[in-house]
């Protein structure tokens, strides 16, 4: 990738990553992937449960007014021609607004040229634009418009911004850059206008008056999404769950080599059969690590493949040929695999840097590539974008025409990520293949994984989140809803993992139900609601289950 300016460093944690035990411990999964549900479950009344559900990030709706001016030659064009050109330029201006807003909100490294400008752990969601009220002025060249964009940051973002109240709205002022129409039109991949000074590393304090304009942005919190399960039933419907992992080139300490080797060892420790005797002999054609598990009474084959740039081989990350091979493998993965994982460097308006971008323009998948990549339209896929500031990649995947916002889940960050270990990849795989003590897949809610990912770094906040969760199952996959309400003695009486035998209270006996993801959310069916459940022995809430109204 020849645009190193846009690639953010992944930060090395000052402390070793560690996992913590939470009150809802069953929503996660340990490294051995065992996840048994307690046999002494009891429903907890709403008034007795802590009213607390947390994810680290929040989306916000940002709105403002701006102006564009057409080339003088359009003064003699028809109304329709002028409006058509105005809409085109407004689209380019939306990209510019998103870029400069991201430059303000995003966290900075101490040596960044604009390290003193903003830095709130936030980003604009590139691509999530709305153009409102485009109006032509009397000169027939100037058009005013209202824009609306989505941004993301920590839940306290609005407390951190220099907010004031105007017209009954919470607003903040920001000086953005004023590239010309011709400059904004320069969007060739890897050579976009915003990758050059003074727009890259934007800092209005160092820009001349004719290079900037002040815009007032209103900001409100977006509607909060609720928890859901990874749709393991769909991922395993064909009897196989295949996963590809890409470790991007790293300049910190060759972490693409170290982490791929650690992950190789970890897979073997999890009981996977290795395709080769050692990491040293692993090549792109070695094949998959394999393991067979049970899912809803069926055998399911797990396959995991590892890819990274290895010096002196066909995937040498310093060469065009090596980078191109890695890029082609990644594109094939997006086309054919259930799960695609990337761990490496990234940044705003960027994507996956698999090869050494300092030496080759090959071996990268940026947001523009992702939007047009061949992906299956009717197949559910899950993507992990583990790197700094990958939030915008979520929109790129959802806007791929073969996905159109469906059949895709993408986990991203809105701030730094930890470069010191492959823990995030291991936790992600563990969540997808979480099993009970008999080796049966036990689908997990997304919140458990996000909590673990956020906990990997102690010197900074990563702000992980998942795009696409609104259409994920709220009822645990493989739930036997036909057994709801039947008398039971143990969980196994009600079905496989995730089906529970729960007491409604003292003297009321135990009835069959199943795990659910969000309190009060639909998914349980008519006559049921989702309530917290606790282990009577430990007196701790461990999850949620469908309760009869």
What are these regions (language model features)?
Residues 252, 265-334, 455-462:
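Functional beta-strand-loop-alpha-helix junction segments that form "active/interaction loops"
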Residues 3-16:
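Bacterial N-terminal signal peptides that target proteins for export
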